[in-house]
């Protein structure tokens, strides 16, 4: 029916025999006037209402962020106070607002001129070649994180300059830049490197590394000891075992893996602590921590550490002793004279027993 109406046929009401009567392909000329639309709520290019944008209120404080001034300066000047703007076809459209732009668009503009009295770059990322540490310089003065608002993103000019410059500065330039009186500095300890836990350990309590000789068949254990005098807690870190003898092949014993059992004598609670069972080899690596609580300074001098390396039996098999040793506990501890005093050192102490 729609196709017939488009072709010029219409229903004939005068002749009942003929249901369809042809009409002219061109309809009669209508009277001049605004056309009536069946859907007045649909926006078409020939019908766009006039939008009104209220003027921007002046800032009472007078302090506008630098990123906001930069984005507003690149936009259309004096457009926010106009009711609308007319394009080439005469259509009304909304002006571009900095609040509706994506954050990535801030990096595509030309480098702006730096404000007077402000440094060119206030936060830098340094990459050191040996261990690829990413750390933030201590002179960064960022007020808020970049994820809090789109205006917290770095300026586009700074990012472009940072890419074009070489990867690192020479020691002479770095020292001259650090000693400049105009370079801002923030009081406080330096920020530790990201993705690196070794730097955090150097600011903790001093530790002592020891090597315990095993008998009777040889081998040794590597330990790292740390003591907290406040809670009376002793931490023993079992690093690895080296040079362990091969387990003797006996029927009904061994074959389940290697483990280390640590015990303080005279006995304290817990009586003994056992490491996880690893694959039996000549140099197994454990990297486990053992904690003994309730040990005051007088108790440390009266106790000793006993360590046994076992080849665990699988199923109903018996354990096989690979080596054992016993050492006075006071010989494994770091100096207890005051942690970070002038006479103490943060460097680990090596001891071979």
Swiss-Prot record:
- Compositional bias, Low complexity, is annotated for 140-150
List, alphabetically, the Gene3D superfamilies matched.
C2 domain
Q: What is the designated name of this protein? A: C2 calcium-dependent domain-containing protein 4D
What are the C2 domain coordinates in residue numbering? 217-343
Stored SUPFAM superfamilies: C2 domain (Calcium/lipid-binding domain, CaLB)
Which segments carry the region annotation Disordered? Answer: 135-191
Q: What is the lineage of its organism?
A: Eukaryota, Metazoa, Chordata, Craniata, Vertebrata
TM helices/strands, residue ranges: none
Q: Which Pfam families match?
A: C2
């Amino acid at each position: 029916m729609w196709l017939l109406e488009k072709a010029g046929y219409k229903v004939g009401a005068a002749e009942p025999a003929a249901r369809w009567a042809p009409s002219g392909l061109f309809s009669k000329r209508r009277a001049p006037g605004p056309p009536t639309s069946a859907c007045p709520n649909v926006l078409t290019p020939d019908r766009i209402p006039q939008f009104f944008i209220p003027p921007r209120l002046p800032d009472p404080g007078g302090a506008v962020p630098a990123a906001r001034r930069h984005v507003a300066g690149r936009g259309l000047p004096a457009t926010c106070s106009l009711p609308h703007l007319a394009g080439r076809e005469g259509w009304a459209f909304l002006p571009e607002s900095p609040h509706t732009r994506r954050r990535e668009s801030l990096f595509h503009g030309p480098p702006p001129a730096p404000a007077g009295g402000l440094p060119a770059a206030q936060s830098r990322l340094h990459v050191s070649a040996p261990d690829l540490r990413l750390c933030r310089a201590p002179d960064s003065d960022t007020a808020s994180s970049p994820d809090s608002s789109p205006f917290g993103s770095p300026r586009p000019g700074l990012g472009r300059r940072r890419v074009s410059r070489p990867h690192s500065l020479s020691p002479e330039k770095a020292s001259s830049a650090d000693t400049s009186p105009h370079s801002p500095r923030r009081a406080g300890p330096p920020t530790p490197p990201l993705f690196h836990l070794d730097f955090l350990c150097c600011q903790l309590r001093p530790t002592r590394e020891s090597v315990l000789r095993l008998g009777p068949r040889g081998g040794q254990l590597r330990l790292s000891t740390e003591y907290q005098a406040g809670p009376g807690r002793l931490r023993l870190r079992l690093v690895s075992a080296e040079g362990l003898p091969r387990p003797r092949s006996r029927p009904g014993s061994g074959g389940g893996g290697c483990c280390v059992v640590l015990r303080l004598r005279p006995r304290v609670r817990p009586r003994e602590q056992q490491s996880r069972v690893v694959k039996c080899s000549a140099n197994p690596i454990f990297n486990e921590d053992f904690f003994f609580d309730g040990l005051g300074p007088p108790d440390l001098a009266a106790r000793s550490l006993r360590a046994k390396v076992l080849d665990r039996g699988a199923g109903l098999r018996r354990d096989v002793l690979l080596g054992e040793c016993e050492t006075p506990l006071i010989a494994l501890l770091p100096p207890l004279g005051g942690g970070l005093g002038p006479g103490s050192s943060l460097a680990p102490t090596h001891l071979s027993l």
